[in-house]
């Protein structure tokens, strides 16, 4: 698990930076590329729910094979000049006569408007981490099987497809803060619907995966690519990964575990939903104040 977390956390930001830049250069819609991952995830979770529930160890062999193929495909990726660091000329020390390389310092982002976006990213990951971590346990507590978990996860993945088809129109029509506010609000609504423990309402909660997580993911990745300084795209995406997979995931797991132990999983869903609404309101007000 440690090895997976270390390598996955390091590879994903660089992968996002490369894919977004290559999509822009070749004029390919990034949403279509992301849709391939959505469809494959839907197929995998549906298969796992029905066929691997009695042989769960096969999942690890399957994941290992997929990561091996992923590594081989990465070897075919072309170089991307936009992700290279901008090299400043070396300076000569007048005393020693030797050249000294300048440190790669300076701001990563062009504007402080990025900080409310990072707060939205943290809030989304905080909520989705608790949601995902305790969804399976919650279903088992209610007496449902792993098959239902596979179906629900498949529904959530398929709900991302309409969003990916429309995300460029939405991005042109609405500002980033408006989209992120709506996305985190949908995440809070998902938690409230899931707490009902009713299968139709839980399915409705999964249908909000696209309007919540996918909108937040797409807006954050593409916005950061526009807001980074030249040569610091990978650092910008790494900052997003630290906020999401680092701070957001860790907080969601630790605080979520405390809430689940103290109040129960269902009550934890409701508490975190209200926390998300509070954070969203604060970030939205801050973003509006900065613009004004």
For each of these PLM feature ranges, what is it?
Residues 1, 194-206:
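Helix-loop junctions at membrane interfaces in 12-TM secondary transporters
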Residues 9-24, 215-229:
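Intracellular juxtamembrane helix-capping segments at the cytosolic ends
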Residues 50-67, 257-276:
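A membrane-interface helix-boundary motif in multi-pass transporters
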Residues 51-52, 162-175, 260-261:
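Helix-to-loop junctions at the C-terminal end of transmembrane segments
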Residues 67-82, 246, 271-292:
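Multi-pass alpha-helical transporter architecture, strongest
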Residues 78-121:
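Juxtamembrane intracellular "pre-TM" segments in multi-pass secondary transporters
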Residues 113-152:
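Helix-loop boundary and gating motifs at the non-cytosolic
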Residues 178-193:
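Structural signature of the two symmetry-related core transmembrane helices
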């Amino acid at each position: 698990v440690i090895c997976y977390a270390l390598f996955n956390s390091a590879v994903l930001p660089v992968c996002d930076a490369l894919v977004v830049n290559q999509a822009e250069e070749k004029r390919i819609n990034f949403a279509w590329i992301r849709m391939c991952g959505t469809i494959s995830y839907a197929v995998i979770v549906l298969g796992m729910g029905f066929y691997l529930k009695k042989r769960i160890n096969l999942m690890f062999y399957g994941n290992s094979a997929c990561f091996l193929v992923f590594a081989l495909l990465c070897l075919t990726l072309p170089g991307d000049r936009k992700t290279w660091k901008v090299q400043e000329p070396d300076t000569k020390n007048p005393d020693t006569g030797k050249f000294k390389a300048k440190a790669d310092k300076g701001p990563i982002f062009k504007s402080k408007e990025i900080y409310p976006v990072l707060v939205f990213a943290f809030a989304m990951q905080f909520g989705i981490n608790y949601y995902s971590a305790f969804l399976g346990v919650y279903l088992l507590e209610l007496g449902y099987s792993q098959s239902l978990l596979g179906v629900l996860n498949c529904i959530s993945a398929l709900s991302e497809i309409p969003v990916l088809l429309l995300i460029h129109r939405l991005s042109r029509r609405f500002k980033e803060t408006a989209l992120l506010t709506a996305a985190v609000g949908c995440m809070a609504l998902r938690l409230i619907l899931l707490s009902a423990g009713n299968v139709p309402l839980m399915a409705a909660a999964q249908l909000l995966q696209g309007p919540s997580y996918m909108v937040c993911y797409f807006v954050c990745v593409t916005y950061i690519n526009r807001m980074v300084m030249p040569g610091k795209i990978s650092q910008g995406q790494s900052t997003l990964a630290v906020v999401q997979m680092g701070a957001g995931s860790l907080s969601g797991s630790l605080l979520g575990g405390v809430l689940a132990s103290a109040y129960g999983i269902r009550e934890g869903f409701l508490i975190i939903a209200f926390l998300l609404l509070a954070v969203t309101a604060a970030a939205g007000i801050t973003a509006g104040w900065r613009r004004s």
